[in-house]
Amino acid sequence: MNIKDLTTEQRNPKSLHIDSATPLEIVKIINQEDKKIADAVGTQDKEIAKAIEYASKRYREGGRLIYVGAGTSGRLGILDAVELVPTYRINPERAIGLIAGGQSAMFRAVEGAEDDLQLGEKDLKDLKLNEKDIVIGLAASGRTPYVIGCLKYANQVKALTISIACVKKSEIGKYADIAIEAVVGPEVITGSTRMKAGTAQKMILNMISTGVMIKQGKVYENVMVDVMPTNSKLVDRACRIIEVATGVSESVASDTLEKADMNVAVAITMLKTGVDKEKAMDILKECNGNISSVVNNY
């Protein structure tokens, strides 16, 4: 398919005269178009759920979440990877974002990088990609050569491959075990896929990574139990999580968090079972870090 024929490259009839619109009219036009995004993502719920299911299994076996993309898509992948570390207390080496052109491309375009098929393979080889890993390829147009190169190589080593595009029958989808294609329609500004397409990709990434973390036992009821309290705001949040999850007072929550070496999951387990820190850690390990299992079995 030619680039000009892609949905993401079409002109949007609803914004043809946006150049002469007032600021309020601009906001209303963009807002009306953005309302279509959630519905487009909703058409892919079964594929997204499948991605969560399969990725959760690989991650539990020691695999890594590896996001690959160019431009906006690459930056969104890096953002998701980076945020998982403090939110769910995971090893930074288990959530990795790759962008065509390397780290400098995060802040400034690197000409020609996204068109380099071999560069994608090289970047994954440098990470020593293996069959336990999960590779998520992002491309709004569904045709970025760098992403195709990544997915092709990932298939060779039998890693799980997931593609996220904003067009139907995407090129990257041909090289993915699971193809997610949320068609959001033409952008308000023609071809500016950082807008609706970028938002759709971010929503899908939120669902996949959050789902995978939930399945690792990183959430109890609907609160984060593996948050990394690295500053005063997060320490306060950690205490509130313990209060909500166990019903104890603020002072008890704070005291137990300190005894648990600032580990929220361990603190909750201590309060739920009445055991000390060492025993709580053993129990959590037995239950694969899942506090619901701890509560039900102890």
Curated annotation (Swiss-Prot):
UniProt entry tagged with the keyword Cell membrane: no
InterPro entries assigned: Etherase_MurQ, Glucokinase_regulatory_CS, MURQ/GCKR, SIS_dom, SIS_dom_sf
Gene3D superfamilies from the UniProt entry: 1.10.8.1080, Glucose-6-phosphate isomerase like protein, domain 1
EC assignment: 4.2.1.126
Reaction it catalyzes: N-acetyl-D-muramate 6-phosphate + H2O = N-acetyl-D-glucosamine 6-phosphate + (R)-lactate
SUPFAM superfamilies named among the record's database cross-references: SIS domain
CDD domains assigned to the protein according to its UniProt record, in alphabetical order: SIS_Etherase (cd05007)
GO molecular function: carbohydrate derivative binding; carbon-oxygen lyase activity; ether hydrolase activity
Keyword Lyase: yes
GO terms under biological process: amino sugar catabolic process; N-acetylmuramic acid catabolic process; peptidoglycan turnover
Keywords in alphabetical order: Carbohydrate metabolism, Lyase
Active site annotation, chain numbering: E83, E114
Record text on subunit structure and interactions: Homodimer.
Family membership noted in the UniProt record: Belongs to the GCKR-like family. MurNAc-6-P etherase subfamily.
Function: Specifically catalyzes the cleavage of the D-lactyl ether substituent of MurNAc 6-phosphate, producing GlcNAc 6-phosphate and D-lactate.
UniProt cross-references to PANTHER family, sorted A to Z: GLUCOKINASE REGULATORY PROTEIN (PTHR10088:SF4)
Protein name as catalogued: N-acetylmuramic acid 6-phosphate etherase
Origin species: Lactobacillus johnsonii (strain CNCM I-12250 / La1 / NCC 533)
Name of encoding gene: murQ
